[in-house]
Amino acid sequence: MTHIRKSHPLLKILNKSFIDLPTPSNISTWWNFGSLLGACLITQILTGLFLAMHYTPDTMTAFSSMSHICRDVNYGWIIRQLHSNGASIFFLCLYTHIGRNIYYGSYLYSETWNTGIMLLLITMATAFMGYVLPWGQMSFWGATVITNLFSAIPYIGTDLVEWIWGGFSVDKATLNRFFALHFILPFTMIALAGVHLTFLHETGSNNPLGLTSDSDKIPFHPYYTIKDFLGLLILILFLLLLALLSPDMLGDPDNYMPADPLNTPLHIKPEWYFLFAYAILRSVPNKLGGVLALLLSILILGIMPLLHTSKHRSMMLRPLSQVLFWTLATDLLMLTWIGSQPVEYPYIIIGQMASILYFSIILAFLPIAGMIENYLIK
């Protein structure tokens, strides 16, 4: 008799995706981050749902409603800290996941890669709108500065910014629509993650060697479900340590002051996970040029499959490409640091050099390294 998980219409889909899925036998811990991202998304949706029950998207009461959640709502403080620090863990997993895909050449699965880039963009938009909701100083000024970037678009820029704001400045209408979008976008992310997984299961997972593994596959359950569960436990431990012992470590002290349109903070900056892109934006003196550089810093990932020149898929056996990859990772850390610093010498010149290096590695150095490695293995 056929097991119900193989015959039931719904369970059959889950079985093919998470139980009997043929998986390469040699995938490492770096392959855990996909499932961790799914766990992060579910955690964010659940904690966000409980926060939304007590939050009021109104400029007069938004800040005090956050205070009310932390002081008066049962376990409201831990729900808020899990949600805000959960976003940081989410982006940490996200960037690690992207880094692993670049290192092991998984971007050659172009459909999976492109849906992943779409997920990244939606996640960034969702996180930005979420940062505005507490209506603190950095929330208000961050929203003002970032939405103002749209005014750099020729002809329609000013009208577009006022359309986004719902008025002539960031105000009640802006907060209201940001709350609505922040609430709905994670559900579109779930749908897109389903598409992402569907494309991945069409091709099967890549592996550290970058070779075809059709002759050496094992079922996903129990081998990788146990492995993913261990990763999940470590993630939960890390999140709880962060939320309980140092909840404000990654936040900005300015956000504990209510939004004041008449008082500009000394140094406006976004959350740490956007600092690399913010540093690239600031490194270009021209406004439109900066906005284009900001966009390209993310969209450049989309052309990576076209820039792959090596005969080897993975970087595991390509020492020259490995050096460039870790240089890129270090460069991103440097950009993150620069984004948190004031706009003055020597930070300006360091930011410009780091931005040039970022684009140079992806557009020129990695493809050239691939060609050199091809020549060396002849």
Swiss-Prot record:
Q: Which residue ranges does UniProt annotate as crossing the membrane?
A: 33-53, 77-98, 113-133, 178-198, 226-246, 288-308, 320-340, 347-367
Residue positions annotated to bind a ubiquinone are 201
Location within or outside the cell = Mitochondrion inner membrane
User: Which terms under GO biological process does the entry name?
Assistant: mitochondrial electron transport, ubiquinol to cytochrome c
The cross-references to InterPro entries, in alphabetical order and at most eight, read: Cyt_b/b6_C, Cyt_b/b6_C_sf, Cyt_b/b6_N, Cytb/b6-like_sf, Cytochrome_b, Cytochrome_b_C_euk/bac, Cytochrome_b_N_euk/bac, Di-haem_cyt_TM
Is Oxidoreductase included in the keywords of this UniProt record? no
For heme b b566, which residues are the binding ones?
Answer: 97, 196
Record GO cellular component, one term: respiratory chain complex III
Per its UniProt record, the required cofactor names are: heme b
Keyword Heme on this protein? yes
Gene Ontology MF terms in the entry: metal ion binding; ubiquinol-cytochrome-c reductase activity
Q: How does it sit in the membrane?
A: Multi-pass membrane protein
Q: How is the cofactor bound?
A: Binds 2 heme b groups non-covalently.
The UniProt entry lists the main location of this chain as: mitochondrion
Keyword terms, alphabetized: Electron transport, Extinct organism protein, Heme, Iron, Membrane, Metal-binding, Mitochondrion, Mitochondrion inner membrane, Respiratory chain, Transmembrane, Transmembrane helix, Transport, Ubiquinone
Binding of heme b b562, residues: 83, 182
What residue range is the signal peptide?
none
Cite the Pfam families for this sequence.
Answer: Cytochrom_B_C (PF00032), Cytochrome_B (PF00033)
| Quaternary assembly | The cytochrome bc1 complex contains 11 subunits: 3 respiratory subunits (MT-CYB, CYC1 and UQCRFS1), 2 core proteins (UQCRC1 and UQCRC2) and 6 low-molecular weight proteins (UQCRH/QCR6, UQCRB/QCR7, UQCRQ/QCR8, UQCR10/QCR9, UQCR11/QCR10 and a cleavage product of UQCRFS1). This cytochrome bc1 complex then forms a dimer.
What job does the chain carry out?
Answer: Component of the ubiquinol-cytochrome c reductase complex (complex III or cytochrome b-c1 complex) that is part of the mitochondrial respiratory chain. The b-c1 complex mediates electron transfer from ubiquinol to cytochrome c. Contributes to the generation of a proton gradient across the mitochondrial membrane that is then used for ATP synthesis.
Further remark, if any? Heme 1 (or BL or b562) is low-potential and absorbs at about 562 nm, and heme 2 (or BH or b566) is high-potential and absorbs at about 566 nm.
Family from the record: Belongs to the cytochrome b family.
This chain belongs to which protein, by name?
Cytochrome b
Lineage, please? Eukaryota, Metazoa, Chordata, Craniata, Vertebrata
